[in-house]
C-alpha cells in the first residue's frame, strides 16, 4: 500500500502505463469556467452514491473521451488500524469497485460537507483503474488533472486529489490488485452505473 500521509503538494507528473502520456486530451487542458459551474452543480445536486458516480463518468468522458459501462459498487467494512485504512479498491479483471464503508460513515458523521467530494475522489480514482490505468502514481496524477480542469483548483474535489491526507490523514491508496487479508461482506449499491443500464434498455 502507498501511505500518502506525508504528501504536501499535488501529485508529481506521472505517465499512463498505456500510452506513456497523461490520458487527459490536449483540447481540455485549459481551465473551463463553465465546466466548473456545470459539474459543481451536478455534484451538489447528487443525492446518493449512484448519482455521484454518474458525475464521475461525465467528468472522465469529457476529459479523456473514455468510459466504461456495466460497473457495480459494493460497500464493505474493510476496517482500519494504526497504520491507516483503504478507501476503496478495484479487484483486477472484474466489474466491481469495493468501497470501505468505515470512512464513509465517519466523514458523514463528522464533516458532512466533505462527504460528496470524498466519494467523488475515491470513485474517480477507482474508475480510472477500471479504464486500464494500473500505475498508482499515474492514476493519482490523472485524477488531479481531471479534478482541477473541471472543478477548479480550489474546489474540495481538487483539494482531495492534491493532498488527501489534509482531510483523511490515515487513508491509504492500495496498490493495484490489492485484496484484503480477511473475508468481507459486500452490500451492493442498487442503481449504480444507471446510465449504462439505461443505454442497454433503450
Regions found by a protein language model. Give the residues of each.
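Compositionally biased amphipathic helical and low-complexity segments enriched in hydrophobic
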Residues: 3, 16-19, 187
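An acidic, glycine-rich, mixed-charge low-complexity segment common to nucleic-acid enzymes
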Residues: 1-9, 14
